[in-house]
Amino acid sequence: MSGNNPSLSYKDAGVDIDAGNALVERIKGAVKRTRRPEVMGGLGGFGALCELPTKYKHPVLVSGTDGVGTKLRLALDMKKHDTIGIDLVAMCVNDLIVQGAEPLFFLDYYATGKLDVDTAAEVISGIADGCLQAGCALIGGETAEMPGMYEGEDYDVAGFCVGVVEKEEIIDGSKVQVGDALIAVGSSGPHSNGYSLVRKILEVSKADKNERLAGKTIGEHLLAPTKIYIKSGLKLIAEHDIHAISHITGGGFWENIPRVLPEGTKAVIDGKSWEWPVIFQWLQEKGNVTTHEMYRTFNCGVGLIIALPKDQANAAVALLQAEGETAWVIGEIAAANSNEAQVEIN
């Protein structure tokens, strides 16, 4: 070493290993609450281990990864970090239930320019809360402190989930047929999609996020955590013949419903079967957004759309409502020509 130059450390370069260790200690309790019996070992290993549940005869693993998009920018601006982790889990696990899978474990990636232990602990505690709601284990993760890559207190998160489904019980839309009923399961708000348009509407309209709307502020409506449909969804799948499930995320109705429909079929949606929650009405009015664009960008109050035999529809709605969900018959499956759109909203 040169005697004239100071001795540099990783901390001098902007990476605080001690802060990372402090974060691990802070989140251990939250992570432990999510543990499933299949999980082997604890935090700190190079890899996380998980056995397959023994109840499955022909288990198929189902994986998913997602983020929360620019909803995160809104959370950062409002300094509210405790529910963004729930959003992260929801966006991943809800994609698994679409195929009938039970989530087993979840991993997270948290990246920031300068690690704030309090903020990171809030986010990861939210992830643990989401995992508890979904019944999956938070089995590991990565916290990356990357000076020069993020501005100020900014951070980003990504999630990764693995679930399991019996091979013979995979839901892939192949059983959908003309005459099937379509059931909607209500959302808690925009969930985690369309937030670039949300932020543009806020900017152009100069709206105040503290303005009150139906008993809550606009900001509270917009940061409402994404609903997690795992427990109600698994119960529904166990008791009814589910032909398809569509998770209404980015691309809205027009893009997500066709993903689970076979050729020659279309979803006919009764647009009068529900009233859009007030936040969607507010967004449409403030942004002068066309109804077509609303259905293309937002869930408009519908988190899942489920296809099943018509004679099971009422019982399925009753089951979902008993599980605490808002649910209703929203339409049906009809025959479609090859040149027709696969979604029709009346």
From Swiss-Prot:
Q: Which reaction does it catalyse?
A: 2-formamido-N(1)-(5-O-phospho-beta-D-ribosyl)acetamidine + ATP = 5-amino-1-(5-phospho-beta-D-ribosyl)imidazole + ADP + phosphate + H(+)
Q: Which Pfam families match?
A: AIRS, AIRS_C
- Copy the pathway line from the protein's UniProt record: Purine metabolism; IMP biosynthesis via de novo pathway; 5-amino-1-(5-phospho-D-ribosyl)imidazole from N(2)-formyl-N(1)-(5-phospho-D-ribosyl)glycinamide: step 2/2
The record's EC number reads 6.3.3.1
Chief localisation class: cytoplasm
The organism's place on the tree of life at top rank: Bacteria
**Protein's name according to its UniProt entry:** Phosphoribosylformylglycinamidine cyclo-ligase
CDD domains per UniProt: PurM
Q: What GO annotations for molecular function exist for this entry?
A: ATP binding; phosphoribosylamine-glycine ligase activity; phosphoribosylformylglycinamidine cyclo-ligase activity
Q: Where located?
A: Cytoplasm
**Cystine connections:** none
Q: Which family does it belong to?
A: Belongs to the AIR synthase family.
Q: Biological process GO annotation list? A: 'de novo' IMP biosynthetic process; adenine biosynthetic process; purine nucleotide biosynthetic process
Instruction: List the GO terms this entry assigns under cellular component, sorted alphabetically.
Output: cytosol
Which UniProt key words apply to this protein? ATP-binding, Cytoplasm, Ligase, Nucleotide-binding, Purine biosynthesis
